[in-house]
């Protein structure tokens, strides 16, 4: 499911530095993580919703590729975003 505009704006401000920096990798990862969390709750409640499940897999894949890019370019920012969003224990 979609996340609210207020949540998205707060994530952009927190991870982007200002409200206009939406292209920063950390911002994109944070927004995808919020959308993944929302979709996960939806899929638990609606087990037969295959279209939403496919959307979830696409978002997870996109986040994985952005995390891989960040890991290869700046390991410090990569570790910080993992810790902030509690994504995985690397």
From Swiss-Prot:
An example Gene Ontology CC term for this record: cytosolic small ribosomal subunit
This protein's record includes keyword rRNA-binding: yes
Keywords, alphabetical: Ribonucleoprotein, Ribosomal protein, RNA-binding, rRNA-binding
Entries under Gene3D superfamilies matching the protein: 6.10.250.3130, S15/NS1, RNA-binding
Domain of life, source organism: Bacteria
Protein's GO biological process: translation
SMART domains referenced in this protein's UniProt entry, alphabetically: Ribosomal_S15
CDD domains in the cross-refs: Ribosomal_S15p_S13e
InterPro entries recorded: Ribosomal_uS15 (IPR000589), Ribosomal_uS15_bac-type (IPR005290), uS15_NS1_RNA-bd_sf (IPR009068)
GO molecular function term, any single one: rRNA binding
Pfam families: Ribosomal_S15
UniProt key word Chloroplast: no
Biological role stated in the UniProt entry: One of the primary rRNA binding proteins, it binds directly to 16S rRNA where it helps nucleate assembly of the platform of the 30S subunit by binding and bridging several RNA helices of the 16S rRNA. Forms an intersubunit bridge (bridge B4) with the 23S rRNA of the 50S subunit in the ribosome.
NCBIfam families (UniProt xref): S15_bact
Subunit structure as annotated in this protein's UniProt entry: Part of the 30S ribosomal subunit. Forms a bridge to the 50S subunit in the 70S ribosome, contacting the 23S rRNA.
Similarity field: Belongs to the universal ribosomal protein uS15 family.
Protein name per Swiss-Prot or TrEMBL: Small ribosomal subunit protein uS15
Organism from which the protein derives: Malacoplasma penetrans (strain HF-2)
